[in-house]
Amino acid sequence: MIALDEFRQGLYPWGPEEGHMAIIRIYTGPDGKSHFQDIEPKLEPRGDQSEVAELIPGSGIVIRRFEPKRTNPWHHAPGRYAVFTLSGAVDIEIGDGTVRRLGPGDILIAEDLTGQGHATREVGPEPRVSVFVPLP
């Protein structure tokens, strides 16, 4: 099981496989720019043909719908959030020009609360629907 502090520090990088759900952390580095980090929770067998990771506490949910082609210039995350993409897709750009695309099933851990922040652009013909879960 992953300790919550290890999760926050992102101590378990992975290389996402084809067809594998992406869990991406975005955070502010010491250089004041946002950075990406791929993470994967360690899953433990439950004995009922399933696996489970340690609980990550959250409080409530916010459901947002973003119009196709919407852009949002450089901004910070409004707080620490786990963002679950249900439909549609979004490109997220960080300060060094790197762009990552999140689609249905992907999770973003948004922690870039200071510095330059990130920019987003909705892609595809359909709206993006995401669930935002505030994290402590």
Q: What is each of the regions a protein language model found here?
A:
Residues 65-68, 76-92, 134:
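Short, conserved beta-strand element in jelly-roll/cupin
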Residues 20-64:
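Catalytic-core "active-site belt" of small-molecule-metabolizing enzymes
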Residues 109-113, 119, 123-136:
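A short hydrophobic beta-strand segment most commonly corresponding to one strand
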Residues 41-46, 59-77, 112-115:
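Conserved short histidine dyad/triad with adjacent acidic residue
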Residues 9-20:
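Short, Lys/Arg-enriched N-terminal segments with co-localized hydrophobic residues
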Residues 61, 71-72, 89-93, 107:
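Short beta-strand segments in beta-sandwich/barrel cores
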Residues 96-112:
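Short acidic-glycine-tyrosine-enriched beta hairpin
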